[in-house]
């Protein structure tokens, strides 16, 4: 297993030199954030990014994400131009030595929360999702804006985009995803690029929009769209684990051990607080609803060799910055995972 860390570029208050100091840290997960969605990532920009990361003794392990343009998700006639651009970006990333791309197919919005600074009993703050609060919100009125969302369309554009999705149900979205996969995977195969779709977060429909990468059956349906070892998933325990329907160990055993299609792992804990509601918490098993020992053991049992990262953390010790992506709690999560891996591996030898 290759430990990696999410980094949001030179404007990220979490610096590469700090990330390098985390025990066992090998790689960086990042992207180029100033290129408009749907445009080609120039090779020279990718090489600049890689050089910056390598100058700190780290590896550019995973690109997360190359965003998928909404015209592709909507299945509009213009989608082929954007898919062509996406394919060229895959080629450029492969030429630069990148071998894994994490992406998602969530309509309009990326990961969604109702509060970015919910105060826990210990005084730390975290991200939470309260279904009742979300139901009262209207994102078209600017009532909710989160890191990672593409807001380039503006308020008027967002209303129009939401209107376009009124005729898109789950099966139409599946059809549009399949079209995209059939196009990009032919090239990904040739350049040996592992394409790892991220589950929808949260794994249910929001604001009347369909979401389809949500559970075991849908992940299996996705994997079966294209027969290639490079067509796979990012298994995010936080996204999938916020509903009791999803069994993380079962998913790791099937999609990892049996199918070998887990190309990237996001490791974080969540505490389920109600139907379709949850808090993000420390990685420790007792802090949330997931058994982190069993999750990490499932990866170790089949010798998962791919990249993983400690995912969202709380804000602790007075740290400020990008919600969910501070240094301190994610570093604690990394060290906790280090300890689990070492103990599990040594126990296997005895």
From Swiss-Prot:
It catalyses: D-mannonate = 2-dehydro-3-deoxy-D-gluconate + H2O. GO terms for molecular function: ferrous iron binding; manganese ion binding; mannonate dehydratase activity. Pathway: Carbohydrate metabolism; pentose and glucuronate interconversion. It holds the Pfam family UxuA. The keyword Manganese applies. InterPro entries: Man_deHydtase, Xyl_isomerase-like_sf. GO terms for biological process: D-glucuronate catabolic process. Keywords: Iron, Lyase, Manganese. Its cofactor is Fe(2+); Mn(2+). Its EC number is 4.2.1.8. PANTHER family: MANNONATE DEHYDRATASE. Belongs to the mannonate dehydratase family. Catalyzes the dehydration of D-mannonate. This is Mannonate dehydratase. The gene is uxuA.
